[in-house]
């Protein structure tokens, strides 16, 4: 075994790429390290494509092994299970920039598996996973237009920081990941603290400039370790068939794409395609209908793109910078804590907000350590939203990714735990979809949070931008339709406030996207965002003054930290009885903070009263109402506070001489007592007759 190793400095860290020792039966295997964070990336591709396949079956699997962090998995089976949300998101992060680098017409199955085998808690594994994937594909021999570079960019004290550590990220106003080739940015994923557009654009350019060292190093690594390139050639176009398809369908498709209603347009497109295929079959029964479908799709794309480049109206009749008609409603559901219905053209999101206690927060145990997430946002995309049937169940990768994007857009304006001590779960149900449903979720979430009384800093809106570029001519599109997303060259999603950007996601399918184009897209997105915010603010301009009557109200009190054990009780008996008998949820913190949650105000008051009783100190000279709990020859023990008993000596029961305690007192009898003394050992001496004397004097 002769390892081939390439090391280079990248920001604050040393990156090492190694091949030739591990997983030698894969087409390529690279052990990639950044500091002590190490991933094994393997690539396997099938040499032959399945006959008739018209898509590229690329699979990216990213898996974090708990042994990488020196942990044993939880659960009964004590082994890793289905991918976590973090693993799914990183798999998508890797997939998105590499997919457009495979050549058109390449339909061989390719699988990339990234396994995290060692992790430094200060160095997240996503960037080195992207670098390792790029290196493995580069040396595999599989057709791939790499190398690809990747960088994380932070923004701390007005300065960009390359690949910040986890500690540095906690103080950063920006967390941006950018990936690209030597000459082009292909993918951006970020969240930010409402930063100006120029800062966001600068971070993309900075990250792309800095990652050139990665691209150069992988090229050198490939020169030394690369396998022979596959003998693959792109399929040759059947020019005669292309001409026939164009003649039969071009005019019909152009007319169909003047229909503005999505379902009607799709129906007419299907009619045109069916007629073309029928005519081709009549002329040649041996014609390959799969090839015809591919050519019809290409023609469809050409027709739509040509109209846009020529300056003609878009599919639904809009100008490039126009936003579709908006409908904004808040408080649409009676029993939810907050709700909104946001409609933009043929895209609609029904968004709900639910408030819970700290106990309802999401607890995440990953290889990077444990963390608690008080704000959750879940995105659902049922098949009926696009007029289809399909499976309903666990969220798919796309749903997880869109939910996280919307979460990033909103997180910057969420209140702190001190400002709003609730856990918050938002669910966005996409009830109609024709493009930009994740950005509709951002808008709907902002509205639902305000309706629920969550004191977010300001409204947030999102917009999806697109691009059509032919040579030096290009058109930037605002609020793209699903078809424009599919047929265009860029999907550029921007969420933010009036003051700046909170989330940015960009996927570019072509090279040649310049800084100028990105700048135009950001400025056009700003105008669209402000327009949407103006409409949203007409529906609900600020958060409600109070939370819903159906939401739990959290009341916070402070107790002596030394009294926490008294509130909990032996084996949790006291706090369990408190919650069951009052119907409240009670949470205790080590500093003595007690949070009582209930939608019933009287129940909260009762819980507070009982906690104050439990934690209060016995005061000498004070009168208490107590209950006799034990009778002895020399007196009776009386409970005056939860967990606090005192002795009424036989001489303190009455002014008269008492021969037998049982003649005057019985078990569970309620009596009024005065505290006479608390000795150094905490023993309490009580008197019934002194209490009676004091009461008589008061009368």
Curated annotation (Swiss-Prot):
Domain KH: 552-611
Top-level taxonomic group: Bacteria
Known cofactor(s): Mg(2+)
Keyword Cytoplasm on entry: yes
SUPFAM superfamilies: Eukaryotic type KH-domain (KH-domain type I) (SSF54791), Nucleic acid-binding proteins (SSF50249), Polynucleotide phosphorylase/guanosine pentaphosphate synthase (PNPase/GPSI), domain 3 (SSF46915), Ribonuclease PH domain 2-like (SSF55666), Ribosomal protein S5 domain 2-like (SSF54211)
One GO location term (cellular component): cytosol
Compartments in which it is found: Cytoplasm
Task performed by this protein: Involved in mRNA degradation. Catalyzes the phosphorolysis of single-stranded polyribonucleotides processively in the 3'- to 5'-direction.
NCBIfam families, A to Z: polynuc_phos (TIGR03591), PRK11824.1 (NF008805)
Assembly and oligomerization: Component of the RNA degradosome, which is a multiprotein complex involved in RNA processing and mRNA degradation.
Protein's name according to its UniProt entry: Polyribonucleotide nucleotidyltransferase
UniProt source species: Shewanella sp. (strain MR-4)
